[in-house]
Amino acid sequence: MSSLSVYHVSSPDLPNKVLTHFDDIAATLAEQGIRFDRWPATTRVAPGTSQQEVICAYQEQVDRLMTEGGYASVDVISLDEDHPRKAELRASFLDEHRHSEDEVRFFVAGRGLFNLHIDDYVYAVLCERNDLISVPAGTAHWFDMGERPNLVAIRMFNNPQGWNASLTGDAIASQFPRLDD
């Protein structure tokens, strides 16, 4: 089940609120300019499925999102616990970073924890299959796929080169719960 935990930066061990109803999650994130939506992930794909196979399986949704948002590139993160580079890939997302463009993730299998650092709050969004999250350019965030990843997410960007992050240098991400905590 998707959830949203909202923390003040001064209390990373105790959320101010925890939401589990889709409408409440979407409304709370919308107040911060974050789109959270449900899109049916009707084709079953397993973590480890190739990028080409995932995009082909979801071509209609990809085309719709690319047109709707004016996105220039699409890729897929598809990992299971047996992936040989899982620790390296996980580490690349765990530090707080920003993008100069919007980032959209459509979860078609598994789950991941998307943390958004906005002003004095951290919005920890547990995303699962059927969840779509759109993070505006410049929003500080980090992502945790867990020690034993199990996820397939389609990612879209305005930048034709795809995922390009700028680290903030803030160690805040290390203070907050991880996916497996």
From Swiss-Prot:
Site entry (Important to generate the dianion), positions: R105
Molecular function terms from GO: acireductone dioxygenase (Ni2+-requiring) activity; acireductone dioxygenase [iron(II)-requiring] activity; iron ion binding; nickel cation binding
This enzyme's EC code(s): 1.13.11.54, 1.13.11.53
Residues given in the record as Ni(2+) binding sites: H97, H99, E103, H141
Cofactor: Fe(2+); Ni(2+)
UniProt keyword terms in alphabetical order: Amino-acid biosynthesis, Dioxygenase, Iron, Metal-binding, Methionine biosynthesis, Nickel, Oxidoreductase
Residues at the site labelled May play a role in transmitting local conformational changes: D102
Entries under Pfam families matching the protein: ARD
Note describing how the cofactor binds: Binds 1 Fe(2+) cation per monomer.
Gene3D superfamilies per UniProt: Jelly Rolls
GO biological process: L-methionine salvage from methylthioadenosine; L-methionine salvage from S-adenosylmethionine
Positions bound to Fe(2+): H97, H99, E103, H141
InterPro entries linked: ARD (IPR004313), ARD_bac (IPR023956), RmlC-like_jellyroll (IPR014710), RmlC_Cupin_sf (IPR011051)
UniProt pathway annotation: Amino-acid biosynthesis; L-methionine biosynthesis via salvage pathway; L-methionine from S-methyl-5-thio-alpha-D-ribose 1-phosphate: step 5/6
Reaction catalysed by this enzyme: 1,2-dihydroxy-5-(methylsulfanyl)pent-1-en-3-one + O2 = 3-(methylsulfanyl)propanoate + CO + formate + 2 H(+); 1,2-dihydroxy-5-(methylsulfanyl)pent-1-en-3-one + O2 = 4-methylsulfanyl-2-oxobutanoate + formate + 2 H(+)
Family note: Belongs to the acireductone dioxygenase (ARD) family.
Function summary: Catalyzes 2 different reactions between oxygen and the acireductone 1,2-dihydroxy-3-keto-5-methylthiopentene (DHK-MTPene) depending upon the metal bound in the active site. Fe-containing acireductone dioxygenase (Fe-ARD) produces formate and 2-keto-4-methylthiobutyrate (KMTB), the alpha-ketoacid precursor of methionine in the methionine recycle pathway. Ni-containing acireductone dioxygenase (Ni-ARD) produces methylthiopropionate, carbon monoxide and formate, and does not lie on the methionine recycle pathway.
Assembly and binders: Monomer.
Name of the protein this chain belongs to: Acireductone dioxygenase
Taxonomic lineage from the root: Bacteria, Pseudomonadati, Pseudomonadota, Gammaproteobacteria, Pseudomonadales
